Design a protein with these regions (language model features):
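Long amphipathic N-terminal alpha/beta scaffold segment
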Residues: 7-27, 31
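Non-catalytic, polymerase-adjacent accessory regions of viral genome-replication enzymes
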Residues: 1-3
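Active-site-proximal segment of RNA-dependent polymerases
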Residues: 49-107
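Short, well-structured alpha-helical patches and their helix-loop capping segments
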Residues: 36, 40, 44, 71-75, ...
């Protein structure tokens, strides 16, 4: 119960249980691996997310008008309206991209040590943050053999299915958002998918190179190769 959880939290002795492995089918026919925490852990993780949202408010404010996922009063509708606003300003060449295996590829040590801890007023919740990102995975024996392969990298990055992960994804990409602002690249990002609008195809191609270089060198992330195929995840298109 809640009072029991509070006692462990006050003493600094709260320990997260193993998560439960589960999969959900994606639109492309593949599966998304989820690591579902127990109910009591979800309560703690949700509270931790609220606390971190407040503590890292200044860091996240750098993503205003850029990031539209996992936030109150923001979503797909607001993202589309922002794109239209930029489009109407004459920037109509669209670079669309998404980050390869984003959640798995997040450097969680860098996330914790370089982005979260320096922005906290004290160290009282450090153990909770570290515990939240190192939960053991359980329940694999209940999955079909073909689904188990989706968990081969469990333990890397930030786990999908964790109530803290949406916020952590925005924290990790906050520097990317700020860098795009400095480059004067009007970007609209929804989680690990983003578009940047340009006035010409030439500037869009240069932008692709700048984005690719920054993500790899600064965050250890890759975007899909630029392609013209119908199913390509990274494209440059004109109206």
């Amino acid at each position: 119960n809640i009072s029991r959880i509070n006692k462990f939290l006050e003493k600094g002795t709260y320990r997260f249980s193993s998560t439960r492995a589960a999969v959900i089918k994606k639109d492309n026919g593949k599966y998304r691996p989820l690591q579902i925490p127990e109910i009591r852990d979800r309560v703690v993780l949700k509270a931790l997310a609220i606390l971190l949202q407040l503590s890292l408010k200044e860091l996240l404010e750098g993503s205003d008008e850029i990031s539209f996922a996992y936030q109150k009063s923001k979503g797909v509708k607001q993202a589309v309206l922002k794109m239209k606003e930029i489009f109407d300003e004459g920037k109509q060449i669209v670079l669309k991209a998404d980050i390869v295996n984003f959640f798995e590829e997040v450097d969680k040590n860098s996330l914790i040590k370089n982005k979260i801890f320096p922005n906290l007023k004290d160290r009282t919740i450090d153990f909770l943050i570290e515990g939240a990102l190192s939960q053991k995975l359980g329940g694999l024996n209940r999955l079909h053999k073909k689904h188990k392969e989706y968990f081969k990298n469990a333990g890397k990055g930030i786990p999908q299915g964790n109530p803290l992960s949406p916020l952590l994804s925005n924290i990790y990409l906050a520097d990317f958002d700020s860098h795009m602002k400095k480059q004067n690249f009007p970007m609209v990002r929804y989680a690990d998918d983003f578009i940047i609008l340009f006035k010409s195809e030439e500037s869009a191609k240069k932008g692709y190179s700048i984005v690719t270089k920054y993500l790899l060198e600064s965050l250890g992330l890759k975007i899909h190769e630029l392609d013209t195929g119908i199913e390509s995840k990274t494209t440059i298109t004109a109206p």
